[in-house]
Amino acid sequence: NKGKTFTSKYVIMTSNTETPVKPTSRRAGAFYRRVMIVDVTNNAVEKWKSDNPGKAVPKWCFNKDFSHLSLSLRGTEAYCKEYVLDPTGRNHQSRRAPPPQQVTLEQLAQKMVVQHTTNTSEFVTQAGDVPVFGFVCQNNEIDTVYNLLAAVKARYGANFNLYKGMVRTAHENSGCGAHVHVISREDNFRGKVFTVSRSRLESVPHLEGDSFRRSLGVVMSDKDVTTMFYYIKGKVINDQVNLTELPANQHVVTVHTVYDMAWALRRHLKWSGQWQLIKAAFEIMCYPDAAACALRNWMDSTDFSEEHVVTQFIAPGGTIILESCHGARMWATGKRLIRAGGITEAGGPQGGVRFAGLGARNVPWSEILREFMTLISHIWSQIKGATVVLTALTFYLKRFRPRIEAKGKNKNKGARKNTGVALTDDEYDEWRQYRTEKNLDLTVEDFLQLRHRAAMGADDSDAVKFRCWYSERQRNYHDLEDVTIIGRGGVKRELIRKGPLRPRGNDYYDEPDDWYSEGVIDGVAHKNAIVSVDDVDGMHKGYAIHIGHGVYISLKHVVSGNARILSEEPKNLTFTGELATFRLNNILPTAVPVGTSKPIKDPWGNPVSTDWQFKNYNTTSGNIYGACGSSCSLTRQGDCGLPYVDDHGVVVGLHAGSGGDKCPSRKLIVPYAKVDMRVRDTCTKQCYKDNSPTISYKGLLVKETGEPRTIMKGTRLHVSPAHTDDYEECTHQPASLGAGDPRCPISLTGIMVNNLQPYTEASPGPDTATLNRVSKMLTSHMEGYVQKSQTEEGYGSAFYMLNHDTSCGPYIGGRKKDHVKDGVLDKNLLDLLSSKWNRAKLGLALPHEYALGLKDELRPKDKVAVGKRRLIWGCDVGVSTVCRAAFKRVSESIMANHALGFIQVGINMDGPAVEDLFKRLERPKHDRYCVDYSKWDSTQPPKVTSQSIDILRHFTDKSPIVDSACATLKSNPIGIFNGVAFKVAGGLPSGMPLTSIINSLNHCLMVGSAVVKALEDSGVQVSWNIFDSMDLFTYGDDGVYIVPPLISSVMPNVFANLKQFGLKPTRTDKSDAEITPIPADEPVEFLKRTIVRTENGIRALLDRSSIIRQFYYIKAENTENWTIPPKKIDTPSRGQQLYNACLYASQHGEEFYTNKIIPLVQRAIEFEGLHIEVPEFHHAVAAYNGYFNGTEGQPNQIAFASGGLGLSSEVFEN
């Protein structure tokens, strides 16, 4: 066999040499570790040869079934029958070999199968060690002891596996019991050993109490007996009930009161786990029809006691039998079933009265002490246990009890009694529906009392009627259908759930059906698009994910066999390696985006590390082609099929296994591969085509669109006729106009390409683990003032909330108002919005494309000289409409509460809100840092943006429209210009919907991550919400940080961390000096404003140069020569602009106003033909104060200014 490669599972070699490899060989240790050696003899042949020398062996010495052979399995590393290898390699005859183990041919074959499965499984599910017991007896007593244990197993319905000898043939699946071996004294057994002193097989009727221990004469504690008889590995749920397999009941409980439920469940738990039953009891109290599902979910995450307890629950929705001992088994059925019988504690295998038993037996001292302590604490535990459970339940009920809310003047003084009750949305709907259907004049207070009486199990007629009505309502809500099934088992009626239950959420606002998911645990990404895959008998196998249009993906070993998804078989099942793609008639209301990049998060949002290199791995389900990763999440059986996502939140792989007990952090990930399922897409408008060739365009990798879209030339900014001679004195000029501009001859295309270069690479951002922690902290902080919101129902109302003066995006030319006439949308816009909305309703991502342009604005002269000009990202009107429908109310809530939070979007810097900022700036013993950032938009890490969008989603109703908006905004933006489409690798487009809020959330997340990292690098473990210790003002890239001394001491490290994240923090004056705290006697600058205290109060002063340049330039018709004054001036608008400039200038003092502003105004009136009077200084101050305090209406250019700056955003953006 030299040179041959063995490819079979099992290799059997025969040899006539007792020692195939000499013990002195270098390869002896490696060889004997890898083989099992069986010595084969034929006793009949040897005896014949001994008794009849020289005669032929007769045929009767051989049998066709090989039963004539005697098989002796050697111990590990036994190179001969007498000795094993010496680990030191010095004297190989110094260690005697253990006696060989006698096995049968069937046992040897089964041992080979078990050994092969164990050795070849790189990825397995986690499981605990199963207890092993051995009963040592004489060789002639093995059959007697085996039969006695088999009889006692049948008598008590035990769960253990019984074997003769050392060979174990049963697999350790969930629900299996302990391993019990009947062995001889020669066997080298590892486990708990009990020596049999006598063996007397008694009749089955006499196998009561301690009889099996007396019959065997073993010294064995009651705890060991319980573990041996009733140990259960893991947790298993059986929906198919077989009466012959059910354990005998110890307790029967009818589910109608909380006390009975709490008392029954208490028996199954340890003291450390009894608190977990409180929530289960409350849920069953409120939703009795869901008792079976609630118990399944509760059992899945509960630690059970080491005592053996069997309880039968009789609920309105069915019957549940729960057996627990270390693990648990449960049988659930929709029928009314009473399991007869019941082995009492006195009649169990542990025996009857402990110290006064009729039969004497040997009791170990540990057992005597344990029984004594149990006897002492018996009465006290009965009283104290009930008290603790009911006390905790009382607190739990008080937590969910509706509270009355004060109004008006009593808002902050507590609620007055009898002033009303605040209902939840569900309770309000129930009250209205019950009152309408029953035609009752029922008040809210009466309804709540009736609801709680019914939930607590009251038996009066009103409570009984309400329970019946509520059960029917819940059944309709879960889309249950009462059907008649005719099969081999006869005719039966069952409740079939037609709609899927959503995965469980960790939110008190979730619907009750969210509490009873059948597998997906809390925190799984894209849980609305995940559905359970079940076996034909209802057992959970794994998960499938909806990727749109009724197409699902899962794993081959999950959907193999008789798998059912949403109560139907998969159709058009296609396998790509281990990945399974199929169709279903039942389509989930939302879907997930899929891609082929590298994952950074596991299904629970924890960071995953992987080289993303694929090969075949041996698993318990065969060879699987995938990649190996590492994650801190603990997985379990049934998690296969859950998604791994990249930094954009796109599903790129599915969970296929873990490293088991040896390496639980090791994960096997199956990558996504695209399969053509002949899906007809619902969205026709898209410029970037994946199947079109990629070309290089002026150094950028782009795809051709076939539709040339040129960059707009010229500018609408003109020099004022009052300053044709001295405009060079102004610090700003219109941005570069392209190749013909003598100030900077770079073409507009060149400027565009230069601006897009930073978007070709993504910034690294914070590490995923820290980012996840800080995201939870920020979400928790915002929950105090941001409320949950609902999605807009139609695209019409969402569209009319948009700014109609902005671009329609890459698919339709012009502005939005150009396509609306008398409030009616034209056909082009209507068709586009309709197609986008129909796709968004399916939860699918929209094409994330923008029309690119260059901003027409004033720029500092030094930036004009080098051709620096900012980009305009014109968002698709369809994407804007969908995002407005999804997040409009959330954004309004954040903007309305800017005084309470960190995000200052929506603040009016020319109003009393500035006073609130000033108060927050004056926190004692805190340092203040003013920070600005260079190239903020292009340095935004995609994973941080994705996390910010998830925070916004947290405060929505998580509808398919929201899922579509999130998937769209998380995807890579596409920029369209000059007939090409450029895909952004990293960064945040300035024209993206909610760009100011998302930028501000990014700002908070990265500053928080930098602070946490700096503190922990310094040895301070951050175990609190970091946002409770600091205050922030963020508006996009502008930031002010108010931090305590602890954080201030590590601020240099914070800014260093921000640079590692890819950001470029600078001082507000853009200098290269180190960022230092602002002294207490110096003003703080925020949003281009200086916040100071003046004689008129707290004011946010606009920069003087920003005010002065208002007089130098006028916005008019488009031109290539901006140095020539415009032909026509809109004098009313221009007069209002300069009047506003006077008001802002008045806040800088009379000297500046009189010496600088009044001459500029007078000259503008003279040369521009304006019809305004120069406001006197005190009049200007009084007018601004009136606007500030809200006593006078604000002019248009103040009221409609963007960015909170207070002046025209078109001219005054820097």
Swiss-Prot record:
It comes from San Miguel sea lion virus serotype 4. InterPro entries: DNA/RNA_pol_sf, Helic/Pol/Pept_Calicivir-typ, Helicase_SF3_ssRNA_vir, Peptidase_C24, Peptidase_S1_PA, Rev_trsase/Diguanyl_cyclase, RNA-dir_pol_C, RNA-dir_pol_PSvirus. It comes from the Viruses. GO terms for biological process: DNA-templated transcription; proteolysis; viral RNA genome replication. The keyword Transcription does not apply. The modification O-(5'-phospho-RNA)-tyrosine is found at Y428. The active site is at H557 (for 3clpro activity), E578 (for 3clpro activity), C640 (for 3clpro activity). This is Genome polyprotein. Protease-polymerase is composed of two domains displaying two different catalytic activity. These activities may act independently. The keyword Coiled coil does not apply. Specific enzymatic cleavages in vivo yield mature proteins. Pro-Pol is first autocatalytically cleaved, then processes the whole polyprotein. It catalyses: a ribonucleoside 5'-triphosphate + H2O = a ribonucleoside 5'-diphosphate + phosphate + H(+); RNA(n) + a ribonucleoside 5'-triphosphate = RNA(n+1) + diphosphate; Endopeptidase with a preference for cleavage when the P1 position is occupied by Glu-|-Xaa and the P1' position is occupied by Gly-|-Yaa. The record marks Q126, A127, E405, A406, E518, G519 as: Cleavage. One of its GO terms (molecular function) is RNA binding. Pfam families: Peptidase_C24, RdRP_1, VPg.
